A protein has these predicted regions:
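N-terminal small-domain helix-loop-helix segment of the aminotransferase-like
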Residues: 2, 6-96, 103, 153
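Anion (oxyanion) recognition and catalysis
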Residues: 24-25, 130, 191
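Short catalytic/ligand-binding loop motif for oxyanion handling, primarily in non-cytosolic enzymes
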Residues: 26, 39-43, 174-175, 193, ...
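Conserved core of the PLP fold type I
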Residues: 58-188, 205-206, 210-224, 228
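Residue-level marker for buried hydrophobic side chains located in beta-strands
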Residues: 169, 197-198
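Walker B catalytic acidic pair
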Residues: 201
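PLP-dependent aminotransferase class I/II
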Residues: 226-237
Length: 237
């Protein structure tokens, strides 16, 4: 059987994966610092969450292309608490962030189009982009008493095939969150080059220290075609 070349990834065990496996096989403790799977973190879920699933109304199948209206309204209510006013018709629910990325790649890009992503960044992007025939170009974050974007470096990375700038706010794995001045510069670049600004805000509620300073990027980047999405409006498991 012949498979597509787009999935011809190197599947050899990495040095980190090998060290993890050997430690697990030896029964030694493992501190999984980037763990983000809530089903493995020992959380005690509110019984009301499970009780809601026993409601006979949950058996009523009423598919809505953008997702259940009440759920989309709940997303709007959440963003209102972050000073962002949205309407349910501006919200589309997906089964995962991976599906959301795939939808966006297909919406914004043709085969061979490019999207700029921060580096260091989330390695899953590389695999998702290949599946949708999109090329990722790395825009390096700069470290100077904390991580930050380099607007001029990003400008030099833009080509005629670039369709969007993609961010994680706060970033994974650096923890860097976009400051107001960075958002203004990124918005200016997007306007100048007719680019979309894609922002993954899955970690928006997990700022360290003065968490009140962590706002949705939409409050800063005005006048830009932007897409934001999150992955925490769900019950895992």
């Amino acid at each position: 059987m012949r498979f597509s070349e787009r999935t011809n990834w190197n599947t050899e065990e990495s040095e980190l994966a090998r060290a993890h496996r050997l430690r697990a096989e030896a029964g030694e403790p493992i501190a999984d610092l980037p763990a983000s799977n809530p089903t493995r973190c020992g959380f005690a879920y509110d019984p009301q969450l499970l009780a809601a699933l026993t409601d006979p109304e949950a058996l009523d199948y009423d598919p809505q292309p953008r997702g259940l209206l009440r759920a989309r309204q709940a997303v709007c209510d959440y963003y209102a608490s972050h000073c962002v006013l949205l309407k349910p018709e501006q919200i589309t629910l997906t089964t995962s962030t991976s599906e959301a990325y795939s939808f966006l790649f297909r919406l914004l890009c043709d085969a061979g189009s490019e999207i700029l992503v921060p580096q260091p960044g989330y390695p899953l992007f590389d695999f998702l982009a290949v599946l949708d025939d999109v090329h990722l170009r790395q825009a390096a974050l700069v470290y100077a008493h904390g991580w930050k974007n380099d607007p001029e470096g990003i400008r030099r990375t833009i080509t005629p095939r670039t369709r969007a700038i993609m961010l994680v706010h706060p970033n994974n794995p650096t923890g860097h969150f976009i400051k107001a001045w960075e958002a203004a510069e990124l918005a200016r670049l997007c306007r100048e080059h007719n680019l979309a600004l894609v922002v993954d805000e899955v970690f928006l509620d997990y700022g360290l220290g003065n968490a009140s300073s962590l706002h949705s990027l939409r409050t800063f980047a005005q006048g830009v075609d932007g897409v934001q999405f999150r992955a925490d409006f769900s019950l895992d498991g």
